[in-house]
A protein has these predicted regions:
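N-terminal maturation segment of proteins
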Residues: 1-201
Length: 201
């Protein structure tokens, strides 16, 4: 699947961004039935700026509480022709964008009943826990109908489980860098460069 041309259909960065917008539009009607409160903060999908794209991962930047700056889901696209659709595009959108980080952070900032340290402070366990939970809502939100996208979501889950094993291996069992890289490469479809990046992050 990593090399099959059917999974790299894009020619331009705009086509990749349009694919994410299609995910957004597909799940939006379902989100409205699941959430009775949605953020006032607007939302955009943008390509990561060229100056930082090589070292960036897909990420969410929070909007401003007063709504003057939108929340932005950034997607690094170095070469659209190699952008693989099986990498869990739908699960990534659910995690980083809606209802993941965009809903959680925006609603938290907009809640004037919360003390400021709770409105603007980050609790990473909660932030990431919510985003991971949102990935599990794919089917309820009209996504994961393509078996390859669902497989991508399961692959993301496996990757996180492997990260936990490697973390314990390195910090408790004394694994070397090479042992950690080898474990990742033997238990998931990750390149050596990808495994090195994970170990050294």
């Amino acid at each position: 699947m990593k090399t099959d041309k059917q999974f790299t259909p894009y020619k331009t960065p705009k086509e990749v961004l349009d694919a994410y917008e299609k995910i957004h539009q597909t799940m939006l009607p379902h989100v409205k039935t699941m959430f009775n409160r949605v953020p006032k903060t607007s939302f955009e999908i943008r390509q990561t700026e060229a100056f930082r794209a090589e070292s960036a991962s897909a990420e969410y930047f929070a909007g401003s509480p007063d709504g003057t700056r939108p929340g932005v889901f950034y997607v690094p696209i170095l070469d659209a022709t190699t952008f693989n659709t099986t990498g869990g595009m739908e699960s990534l959108f659910l995690h980083e964008a809606i209802p993941g980080h965009h809903y959680q952070i925006s609603l938290q900032q907009e809640d004037t009943l919360l003390p400021k340290f709770m409105r603007y402070g980050g609790n990473n366990a909660y932030v990431e826990g919510w985003a991971l939970y949102c990935e599990s809502l794919g089917k309820e939100l009209g996504l994961y109908t393509d078996p390859y996208q669902y497989m991508g979501a399961l692959g993301d889950e496996m990757h996180r489980a492997i990260r936990l094993v490697v973390d314990v291996g390195m910090h408790w069992k004394g694994w070397t860098r090479e042992e950690a890289i080898a474990y990742m490469m033997s238990n998931e479809p990750i390149s050596e460069d990808g495994a090195v990046a994970e170990i050294e992050r």
